[in-house]
Amino acid sequence: MKAGTACVALALCACHEAPSRRASGASNLVLITVDTLRADHVGTYGYARARTPALDALAARGTTFERAYAAAPITLASHATLLSGRYPPGHGARDNGMRASESVATLATVLGASGFRTAAFVAAFPLDHQFGLARGFDVYGDRLPRMPNGQPSNERPAAEVINDAIAWLHTINNQQSTISNLHFFLWVHLFEPHAPYGDPASGRSVIDRYDDEIATADREIARLLDALAEVRDRTLVVAAGDHGEAFGEHGEYAHSIFVYDTTLRVPLIMSGPGIHEGARVQAPVTLADVAPTAAHAVGAAMADVDGIDLAPALGGGALPARELYAESFAPLVEFGWAPLRALRTDTWKLVAAPKPELFDIERDPREERNRAGDERSAVQNLTDRVNRYSAADLPTPSSLDRETALRLRALGYASGSAIANQPSIANHQSPITNRPDPKDRREVAARIAQVTSGELTGPALLSALEGIVRDDPRNGQARLRLAYARLQAGDCARAEPEFHAAAATGLPSADIYLGLATCFGRRNDLAAAERALDEARRLEPDNPTVVANIGILRSAKGDQPGAIAALRSALAADPALNEARFNLALAYARSGRRSEAAATARELLARLPVNALQRTEVERLLRAVQ
């Protein structure tokens, strides 16, 4: 252990008092979530090729839950359940891009109100503070680095997350002289195993690259646990995956669509005072159990939760028989297909869908034989019960700003475009029967996973998108992606009709008309480009990218004052729009306002990373106006 880390740990250990408030001897809580981590790729779960010594050592010091399940196979919904103890219908964040309800208590709000210092450090944009999980945290570290083009990244390395977490421990340690009874709740979220896994051009298999990223996350977990070693006897550590990952099982790749156990089963390990070491719990549990269990362990309580306190199992006892709920609303929210809901009992697992599936999970743990046709009474009984879980209102997702939608899309999520502004999502009982069953769209879903994984480029990417559109012609998001892929390949003649086809699906996206404006501009049809931008602005009047493109068009038409006004307005709304800043400098130069052009170009150079591709062009402009 490094000397500085040891000092932090020893000092924190010395500060802990007030044993009366602790139910298990723990006065601190550390929650570690690893995105997209399958249980069967962790050593303690029997994976022969595992490279997870830190997680395995944590399991040896604590209790491993053999059958732990996420409530949703997607990042935001699963984490909202984990932090609140509520299933997705209860917290409202049922897909990425939605927002967790402010009325729902979380570990952070409960422990913060009890005097705990609270901090979270997350690694990816789906957990950005705007989506509602930052409530109750004194510090919510969601700042992501910028890419070479100056735009914000959508994720950051595990090492940066752990560095921030350890730095926060230093901070609260340095403040110990003013804190009489120090208790802390620290949550760290690591994104490494999420696609894309490493470099697809490396020649290594997808599984090998996935395991490489798990190993990276595990090394950083080891660093954090080392920093906490001296407070181990007073700290509950919970490590969990948020959901799994599919590699072809059931025809699925990646996650978010289906609710098979390949994407729902996750590792869940708890270690701390009063917890049996090396114990293994066979009873099925849900991530909704984490919040009530952790709160109780540190002397607090979570009210109005769907999960239960797992304290009996942590002490070697039994858990009651019960049923567990899970859902995926991504098929509806992202593609307009039927949502999927699952209910697990000791014997059965129902997947409620237009074509329901029923699995005997004791005899058929891989969910390979659908018994729905043979067990109709069980299907009806479980369907009635699953409907009770998902009876809560589902807020209609608000239209996301373009940057948010693009950042979610870059991580493989279509971000609500399929059903935006359709109130029927709030009553999701009816859409189940009159929408496509995701099972009947397996090949489309597999191609979508390929497209969003980062594994495909060039002609292979175009071919996959063409296959999606051929098999699912009403998929507006796929048509939009195909249109942009053709546009980027320089094929405006084929991109333009695809943009129109995307609009015909009812997709309410300004991106359609931004793409059309680009096509029209390339053939110098400025009047058509202006009409397209007017439609984009009608759809998204406050979208700074739309306003910036209006400014660029005005400059091309010779209206430099109008261009300057629009570009300045766009930059006031979003200072990160580097292309708008460059075009503002051009408009100043074309107006003869050389000093303002030079100042704008210098400001842009200061914002661009040293290795940004645009620097040469900006430097050329600066030389011309000086």
What are these regions (language model features)?
Residues 471, 505-506, 539, 573, ...:
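Structural marker of alpha-solenoid helical repeat scaffolds
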Residues 2-13:
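Bacterial N-terminal signal peptides
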Residues 476, 507-511, 544-545, 578-579, ...:
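Boundary/linker segments of alpha-helical solenoid repeat arrays
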Residues 561, 565-602:
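Ankyrin-repeat and related helical/solenoid repeat scaffolds used for protein-protein interactions
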Residues 594-626:
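Terminal, low-structured helical/coil segments at or just beyond the last alpha-helical repeat
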Residues 12-492, 497-500, 504-518, 522, ...:
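Catalytic domains that recognize anionic headgroups
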